[in-house]
């Protein structure tokens, strides 16, 4: 039996599909990320704790190659001095893909906590209660409620809500191993201390502590008020199976194992694969 001439159209179409697939796979890369916003500051005058910055993390994010992705690291909120409520932290972002809100402000005497990535804690007051701030959906937890008898609340954290008045503890942090080491970040600030509120650690996105009713240097005579604590600045961490071809902003590079490349941004910058 004679052999018919084979058509090359099927081979041609298969080659086109293969080339198209190569173009798609060579133009994208799949990464893991951790993006944390800046923490809110604590309120003064029996203030509530600041909320932690929004906390977003996941693997399997497909991003474009051959373009620079802008990294923004949110600043932690400054303290309000010895009067008034705290301030909201600034948001952090990874290109156009992921944004994490800044943490909510801690309330000053008699004031409610502010909304944010995690909510700020309500302040204490002489009578009645104050409400905690509301967290951004999927990014954190609510702040606690302040109570009468001057009992302030903790700010929300990535891992839990802030405790209600009783000079409540801040909400728990959340732990990540994206760098190859287990590190806890984004805890809520505690309610008022005995004097000034504690400042949060840089690049953790944690909230600042609430200020007490007596300033640190005024003794027990009621002169002055303790300020709230600063919020911690945020952080953006990218883990990829390939080395970046270009970065700006001097990120810390970590190579925990073969084909695992981690870039830790503690300040603004960019990354290109």
Segment roles from a protein language model:
Residues 20-24:
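Large eukaryotic, non-enzymatic subunits of multiprotein complexes that serve as scaffolds/tethers
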Residues 2-14, 19, 30-273:
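Low-complexity, glycine/proline-biased repetitive segments and flexible coils/loops
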């Amino acid at each position: 039996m004679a052999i018919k001439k084979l058509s090359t159209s099927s081979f041609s179409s298969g080659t086109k599909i293969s080339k198209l697939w190569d173009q798609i796979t060579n133009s994208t890369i799949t990464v893991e990320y951790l993006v944390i916003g800046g923490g809110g500051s604590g309120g003064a005058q029996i203030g509530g704790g600041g909320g932690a910055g929004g906390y977003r993390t996941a693997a399997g994010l497909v991003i474009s190659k051959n373009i620079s992705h802008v990294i923004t690291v949110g600043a932690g909120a400054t303290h309000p001095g010895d009067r008034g409520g705290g301030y909201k932290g600034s948001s952090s972002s990874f290109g156009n893909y992921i944004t994490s809100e800044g943490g909510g402000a801690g309330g000053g005497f008699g004031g409610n906590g502010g909304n944010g990535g995690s909510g700020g804690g309500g302040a204490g007051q002489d009578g009645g209660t104050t409400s905690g701030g509301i967290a951004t959906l999927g990014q954190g937890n609510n702040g606690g409620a302040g109570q009468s008898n001057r009992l302030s609340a903790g700010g929300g954290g990535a891992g839990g809500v802030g405790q209600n008045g009783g000079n409540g503890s801040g909400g728990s942090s959340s732990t990540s191993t994206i760098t190859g080491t287990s590190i806890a970040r984004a805890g809520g600030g505690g309610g008022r201390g005995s004097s000034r509120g504690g400042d949060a650690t840089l690049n953790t996105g944690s909230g600042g502590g609430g200020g007490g009713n007596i300033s640190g240097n005024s003794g027990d005579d009621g002169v002055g008020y303790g300020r709230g604590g600063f919020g911690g600045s945020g952080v953006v961490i990218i883990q990829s199976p390939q080395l970046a071809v270009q970065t700006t902003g001097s990120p810390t590079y970590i190579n925990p194992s073969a084909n695992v490349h981690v870039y830790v941004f503690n300040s603004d910058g960019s990354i290109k694969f």
